[in-house]
């Protein structure tokens, strides 16, 4: 792959855990290791990660980097040290505010956007920050959905291209042949019709609606269970809510290892995350890579219609799109798939085929490499 020498500058990078971290690392890993380097903040386990990385990592002492004069100085030093032809900022805010200073010295830059840039682009004060950070950018790759790209476009100067780059799923990691029986045994849900939800436990993701949907689901599909994977600030509320669900119908797996995560997707008969928009539309789901990962494991998906989430599925073919605030609609969609295993399996197979065809990480890396060359 022909790629100019590229320095990724980001606050979000492994061994930190998160969707942006996984996206950026998946892209870097698919670029030639001698043509890419990463400048990122300190993190627990960072030294071990950096030693194992096949590319250079300029790990900074701070836990979070702000666009301050000292960080600017170190950034310019890293550009010179690595001999970078182009800089890719992992997010528009805050570090891409250093981008115009790079352009002044002749180093082009790209500023990536994710779901967070949605509200940055619509709020008056932060709208101006987005415009300033991207004022001299060669391009703004939106690494989530066309929905987010349309909103970001309103904050980016007209002469700066804004392009969509859908995240992918690692097809060697997320696949249909994974064993999972030990996991269902561990959580006491073996041989039950199983719904799996993988996500951070926050209100937008809709775990509360899934819990409320369990009584009607169980009326149609006896013994159906919900396995909630992940942790977050909403956990205590969800545990209290689950106490009112049918006995044994809701199980919390907590945070699981990256190695086991694909097997949890595979353990379910249906994957569901009925995400919903909140705060009058200020909080939306930018994309939802969990839907792609579940589909890559050949499981049908039930997707809440918030923001760009609908772009992750082919409705009626690879899964079902629902109003994530409507308990009855969510229960009907999930229950219909649990009650019809043949239909669910067909959707799962179609989902895997769609991910293979259109959402592999190698495809995304080639797209990014093209934009880096054009910069």
Regions found by a protein language model. Name each.
Residues 266-284, 299:
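Acidic donor-binding loop of glycosyltransferase active sites
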